[in-house]
């Protein structure tokens, strides 16, 4: 059941769980509908995307807190959001997924296109953006050479609109920007055509090669939450606790010296307080009880240390990212023991992998079935997106000997191509098999040539030269 969590105040659009936009199927957007979505998107930017980006680049809220008069004002930032996102993005997307087809000719063409379109880099940027914002997009377009290209679009630059059916199919993708005068320009991408717009004016539709909406949304969970969305308050509390800790250190460094019972009044009889030299004195009639000492307050160092350590542990625990600096990852722990420590992050990556494969398959469907899809695979095989195999390999330290041994054992019950895919560093198992076959063929020819009598070797060599010519 689709639950409407917000009705956009302008136009016919609605918002469901995860800040997902929906619109009546078969309809196109008018100006009112478009700006209803853009206004909600702007609010989403202010409420989520901008704060998340600020925290990722270490511009935390504590830096904007007002200064306190006559007090220490340390504002320390612990870059936990960047640490969590980069650690997980490297683990999940540090190794680009392999994309393969069974047909050798089409697979070779596909690998060339993947390299030419810099798919690995685009994929890594999507993984990072999903970690920060909770979602990201991949947009297909035609380059200047009329060849299909792809580019990632961050959620503060565009948004997807789905239809209101139970399957929630993509209905339109909007990419837009604002200039320094706050004028809005952009493009609405539909299936079969696009519409440019500027401010409150929609241009005439322009047909293009894409038979479906040429954009796909990537996300790791239906709620569209980023890696550190659930631990923001803990991170802010950590910044505050560490800053207070630094304030306390400064306090003891800058403690006031108190002098009692000494007649050090100025000529006007005023009690002198020197805030620059941090010195306070007060005369006392009984000079025999004069006292000079530093003013201090109770030391809460142990309590602060416990709070800081507890916050750090909670941030790692609730974000399901392991603390690689923890003592649990040192020593000679077995591979199985380390796998258990990584289990929460592995589970999260497994969920995200399924979501990403679903989105990637949809994108290749758009590419293969387009009017110029024959530039990637043969047009007759435009349905081959159904046969695509996506393989994700987690980026983590590997025991190559164990990996090779596992692949060898697996080859007895699996295909050689599947077994090779288990070995880290092999991005294209099919190409590796072809190279292996070529090596075996060349080795066999050399062995046969060496086994022949000398008077026959020359003839074989001549035959090989003639065949090459």
Where are these regions (language model features)?
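Short, charged/polar micro-motifs that form catalytic or ligand-binding hotspots
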Residues: 113, 128, 294-305, 346-353, ...
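Short amphipathic alpha-helical segments
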Residues: 106, 114-122, 130, 230, ...
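Glycine- and charge-rich intrinsically disordered segments
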Residues: 1-15, 239-246, 250, 256-261, ...
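Extended, regular secondary-structure scaffolds
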Residues: 127, 131-132, 137-224
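C-terminal helix-loop subdomains that flank or include functional centers
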Residues: 283-285, 310-324, 328-469
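Extended, helix-rich architectural segments
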Residues: 1-149, 464-469
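Extended hydrophobic-aromatic, low-complexity segments
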Residues: 30-34, 56, 63, 304-306, ...
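Extended, charged amphipathic alpha-helical segments
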Residues: 8-9, 204-337
């Amino acid at each position: 059941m689709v639950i409407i969590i917000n009705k956009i105040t302008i136009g016919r659009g609605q918002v469901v769980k995860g800040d997902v936009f929906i619109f009546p199927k078969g309809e196109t957007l008018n100006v009112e509908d478009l700006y209803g979505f853009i206004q909600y998107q702007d609010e989403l930017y202010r409420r989520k995307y901008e704060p998340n980006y600020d925290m990722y680049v270490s511009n935390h809220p504590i830096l904007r807190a007002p200064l306190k008069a006559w007090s220490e004002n340390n504002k320390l930032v612990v870059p936990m959001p960047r640490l969590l996102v980069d650690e997980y993005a490297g683990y999940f997307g540090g190794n680009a997924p392999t994309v393969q087809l069974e047909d050798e000719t089409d697979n070779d063409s596909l690998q060339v296109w993947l390299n030419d379109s810099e798919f690995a880099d685009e994929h890594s940027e999507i993984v990072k953006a999903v970690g920060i914002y909770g979602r990201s997009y991949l947009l297909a377009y035609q380059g200047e050479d009329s060849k299909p290209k792809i580019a990632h679009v961050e959620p503060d630059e565009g948004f997807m609109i789905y239809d209101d059916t139970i399957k929630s199919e993509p209905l339109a993708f909007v990419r837009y920007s604002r200039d320094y005068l706050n004028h809005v320009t952009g493009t609405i991408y539909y299936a079969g055509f696009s519409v440019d717009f500027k401010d409150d004016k929609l241009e005439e539709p322009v047909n293009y090669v894409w038979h479906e909406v040429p954009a796909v949304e990537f996300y790791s969970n239906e709620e569209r939450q980023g890696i550190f969305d659930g631990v923001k308050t803990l991170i802010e509390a950590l910044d505050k606790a560490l800053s207070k800790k630094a304030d306390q250190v400064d306090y003891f460094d800058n403690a006031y010296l108190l002098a009692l019972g000494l007649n050090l009044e100025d000529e006007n009889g005023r009690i002198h307080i020197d805030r620059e030299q941090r010195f306070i004195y007060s005369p006392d009639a009984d000079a025999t009880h004069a006292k000079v000492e530093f003013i201090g307050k109770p030391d809460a160092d142990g309590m602060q240390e416990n709070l800081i350590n507890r916050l750090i542990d909670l941030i790692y625990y609730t974000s399901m990212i392991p603390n690689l600096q923890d003592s649990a990852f040192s020593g000679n722990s077995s591979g199985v023991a380390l796998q258990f420590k990584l289990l929460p992050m592995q589970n999260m990556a497994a969920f995200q992998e399924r979501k990403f494969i679903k989105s990637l398959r949809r994108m290749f469907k758009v590419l293969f079935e387009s009017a110029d899809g024959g530039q990637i695979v043969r047009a007759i095989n435009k349905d081959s997106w159904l046969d695509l195999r996506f393989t994700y390999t987690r980026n983590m330290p590997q025991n190559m000997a164990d990996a090779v041994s596992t692949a060898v054992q697996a080859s007895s019950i699996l295909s050689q191509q599947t077994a090779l895919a288990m070995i880290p560093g092999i991005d294209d198992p099919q190409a590796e098999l072809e190279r292996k076959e070529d090596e075996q063929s060349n080795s066999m020819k050399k062995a046969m040539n060496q086994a022949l009598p000398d008077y026959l070797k020359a003839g074989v060599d001549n035959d090989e030269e003639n065949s090459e010519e």
